[in-house]
Amino acid sequence: MPLNVSFANRNYDLDYDSMQPYFFCDEEENFYHQQQQSELQPPAPSEDIWKKFELLPTPPLSPSRRSGLCSPSYVAFASFSPRDVDDGGGGSFSTADQLEMVTELLGGDMVNQSFICDPDDETFIKNIIIQDCMWSGFSAAAKLVSEKLASYQAARKDGGGRSPARGQGACSTSSLYLQDLSAAVSECIDPSVVFPYPLNDSSSPKPCASPDSTAFSPSSDSLLSSAASSPRASPEPLALHEETPPTTSSDSEEEQEDEEEIDVVSVEKRQPPAKRSESGSPSAGSHSKPPHSPLVLKRCHVSTHQHNYAAPPSTRKDYPPTKRAKLDSGRVLKQISNNRKCASPRSSDSEENDKRRTHNVLERQRRNELKRSFFALRDQIPELENNEKAPKVVILKKATAYILAIQAEEQKLISEKDLLRKRREQLKHKLEQLRNSCA
């Protein structure tokens, strides 16, 4: 399908500059005329005074298509066969026109809206966005921009010296593109200059190869074909790139943005720049496990179940066995609650509440036992045996009188017993005398 059907004679500067959208509050009023009159004469009492200072509500101008030819779709332009362009009459277009056609087709205007800079400028390396760790995800995008700019510059230099004839075939175009790619790789920014420490093993950009490296030399055809199929740098070895299918520029940009998301919260390991450059070289076949660093932050759980040594010793008393089990269970629960609150300043208050509660339990137990004793005493008094509502004072008085009566009767019985014993003794003596007289 020829790509220059509808893009043959289009001037993008005129299209964007001549059709600027303007927004008016009312279509019938003359905005410029009203503004000029408001500048010359003061506003009427019924007129809004702020209309005098009102500006034209125009949106920001779009960047010129001619000034930003560093579009990321240049890689996609080099990937398709130039035979389609030549067959469709594309031989009369320059390299810039073909780049604009591919940019319009793919809609790749990311670079014009985000990064418009010169890769040879020293301020590009010292840019605060690159130096900032929060914006370090844009370093790979900036590197991509520098590669595209370098490739476009090489294409312009070669395009100025070439003849207008473009019927050489796919081999010449692909070799030219590979030379531009090697030039772009040689001019890219070394991440070791910008980032002395790696941000992440999977997302950190690898240092670019030198211009004299064999990985990007035009003599090695297999590696160059793999670089043509995937023009973006990858953390994996270059030998594995031959099996990867060719991808478009938009897909590869989305994949790179997904891969280079950086977790700002986590604290990653730090290696010296020498070791990082050795581990990040393309000749490394496998990623070694990073050594443990003391800078890694870990969350640990501190147990709060500790004994409160500052608490005063509890004074235990010997209680009856029937109530000791309940008191022990209550103390166990209270000790658990006190251990949970050992770090709070209310530990002494909780201990006082525990002692007060224990005292209340013991007092209630004493009162219950006293009541049972009164009931037992009432049952022993004949006058109050069947009186369940007898007060304690009456029970005590009747009990005292009953005890005194019992004691008096006891003394009477004791004296009577003594008299009977004496009488027995007398009778026994008299019986003995009678036996002796009969004998």
Curated annotation (Swiss-Prot):
Residues 335-347 have a biased composition (Polar residues). Residues 251-263 have a biased composition (Acidic residues). Phosphorylated by PRKDC. Phosphorylation at Ser-329 by PIM2 leads to the stabilization of MYC. Phosphorylation at Ser-62 by CDK2 prevents Ras-induced senescence. Phosphorylated at Ser-62 by DYRK2; this primes the protein for subsequent phosphorylation by GSK3B at Thr-58. Phosphorylation at Thr-58 and Ser-62 by GSK3 is required for ubiquitination and degradation by the proteasome. Dephosphorylation at multiple sites by the PNUTS-PP1 complex promotes MYC stability by preventing ubiquitination by the SCF(FBXW7) complex. Ubiquitinated by the SCF(FBXW7) complex when phosphorylated at Thr-58 and Ser-62, leading to its degradation by the proteasome. Ubiquitination is counteracted by USP28 in the nucleoplasm and USP36 in the nucleolus, both interacting with of FBXW7, leading to its deubiquitination and preventing degradation. Also polyubiquitinated by the DCX(TRPC4AP) complex. Ubiquitinated by UBR5 when not forming a heterodimer with another bHLH protein, leading to its degradation: UBR5 recognizes and binds a degron that is only available upon heterodimer dissociation. This is Myc proto-oncogene protein. The modification Phosphoserine is found at residues 6, 62, 71, 81, 151, 293, 314, 329, 344, 347-348. Efficient DNA binding requires dimerization with another bHLH protein. Binds DNA as a heterodimer with MAX. Interacts with TAF1C and SPAG9. Interacts with PARP10. Interacts with KDM5A and KDM5B. Interacts (when phosphorylated at Thr-58 and Ser-62) with FBXW7. Interacts with PIM2. Interacts with RIOX1. The heterodimer MYC:MAX interacts with ABI1; the interaction may enhance MYC:MAX transcriptional activity. Interacts with TRIM6. Interacts with NPM1; the binary complex is recruited to the promoter of MYC target genes and enhances their transcription. Interacts with NUP205. The gene is MYC. SUPFAM superfamilies: HLH, helix-loop-helix DNA-binding domain. Residues 201-360 are annotated as: Disordered. Disulfide bonds: none annotated. The modification Phosphothreonine is found at residues 58, 315. Residues 209-238, 279-288 have a biased composition (Low complexity). Residues 413-434 are annotated as: Leucine-zipper. The modification N6-acetyllysine is found at residues 143, 148, 157, 275, 317, 323, 371. Residues 266-278, 315-331 have a biased composition (Basic and acidic residues). The keyword Transmembrane helix does not apply. It is found in: Nucleus, Nucleoplasm; Nucleus, Nucleolus; Nucleus; Cytoplasm. There is a cross-link at residues 52, 143, 148, 298 (Glycyl lysine isopeptide (Lys-Gly) (interchain with G-Cter in SUMO2)). The 9aaTAD motif is a transactivation domain present in a large number of yeast and animal transcription factors.
